[in-house]
Structure formats: structure tokens, C-alpha cells
């Protein structure tokens, strides 16, 4: 069996609306084999126009990956390689895809939203 990678997907809130609803991420955790593709989904707080993806590797600080703001072109400056991609459909749900996973991809992946 190939090397297994652990993708802990956590959620992070940058503010919350008056109802207390928060960012939703799925899956909440993901274990995969090296070389497999992984897709992570983020559903932001209703009404929030900005969406961010970060990751945190063991013993490291948060690392910015990508930022979406409304209908503007995303800031992809933090994506570590062409194996990483993200999209946001309809100004709402975002999907982060990691193709051909490697050992160094093992991290906590976080999504946040804001006004």
C-alpha cells in the first residue's frame, strides 16, 4: 500500500453573522494515498463576498493559498504548485483541488470568509 497522507480540514471563521452560522468545510478530514487527487469544499458564511484558503503544515504558521473577492479575478499568488487549483462558483461555494498528492501536502487546510 502506498504512503498515506493525512489531510485535516478544519474550519476558520473571520466574523460571523448575527445568527451564528459559520463557514462549512467538507470533508472534515481526509486520508489518501500518495499520488491520488483530493478535493476540499468550502461553503462560506451567507452574505460574505471574500473567501480565503490557507494551510498549516506541522510545526509551521498559516500559509496563504488563494483569495477570492466577489467576481474579481482570484489572487492565486500563494498556490505552491500547478498541482493546486481552486474555483469559486456563483460567488459562493469554493473547491480546492490538489492533484497527485505528495507527502509535503499533508497539512491542515483552512477556509475563511469575510465581508
Swiss-Prot record:
Subcellular location: Cell membrane
Cellular component terms (Gene Ontology): plasma membrane; T cell receptor complex
Gene Ontology BP, a term: adaptive immune response
Annotated signal sequence range: 1-21
Main location: membrane
InterPro entries xrefs: Ig-like_dom (IPR007110), Ig-like_dom_sf (IPR036179), Ig-like_fold (IPR013783), Ig_V-set (IPR013106), TCR_beta_variable (IPR050413)
Domain Ig-like residue range list: 22-115
UniProtKB keywords: Adaptive immunity, Cell membrane, Disulfide bond, Immunity, Immunoglobulin domain, Membrane, Receptor, Signal, T cell receptor
Annotated S-S bridges: 42-111
Subunit structure: Alpha-beta TR is a heterodimer composed of an alpha and beta chain; disulfide-linked. The alpha-beta TR is associated with the transmembrane signaling CD3 coreceptor proteins to form the TR-CD3 (TcR or TCR). The assembly of alpha-beta TR heterodimers with CD3 occurs in the endoplasmic reticulum where a single alpha-beta TR heterodimer associates with one CD3D-CD3E heterodimer, one CD3G-CD3E heterodimer and one CD247 homodimer forming a stable octameric structure. CD3D-CD3E and CD3G-CD3E heterodimers preferentially associate with TR alpha and TR beta chains, respectively.
PANTHER family (alphabetical): T CELL RECEPTOR BETA VARIABLE 7-2-RELATED, T-CELL RECEPTOR BETA CHAIN
Role: V region of the variable domain of T cell receptor (TR) beta chain that participates in the antigen recognition. Alpha-beta T cell receptors are antigen specific receptors which are essential to the immune response and are present on the cell surface of T lymphocytes. Recognize peptide-major histocompatibility (MH) (pMH) complexes that are displayed by antigen presenting cells (APC), a prerequisite for efficient T cell adaptive immunity against pathogens.
Protein name, UniProt field: T cell receptor beta variable 7-2
Organism: Homo sapiens (Human)
Gene: TRBV7-2
Amino acid at each position: 500500500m502506498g504512503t498515506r497522507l493525512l489531510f485535516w480540514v478544519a474550519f476558520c471563521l473571520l466574523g460571523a453573522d448575527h445568527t451564528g452560522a459559520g463557514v462549512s468545510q467538507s470533508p472534515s478530514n481526509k486520508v489518501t494515498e500518495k499520488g491520488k487527487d483530493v478535493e476540499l469544499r468550502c461553503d462560506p458564511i451567507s452574505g460574505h463576498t471574500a473567501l480565503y484558503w490557507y494551510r498549516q503544515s506541522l510545526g509551521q504558521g498559516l500559509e496563504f493559498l488563494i483569495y477570492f473577492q466577489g467576481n474579481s479575478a482570484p489572487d492565486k499568488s500563494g498556490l505552491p504548485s500547478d498541482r493546486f487549483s481552486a474555483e469559486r462558483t456563483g460567488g459562493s461555494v469554493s473547491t480546492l483541488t490538489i492533484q497527485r498528492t505528495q507527502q509535503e501536502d499533508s497539512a491542515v487546510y483552512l477556509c475563511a470568509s469575510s465581508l
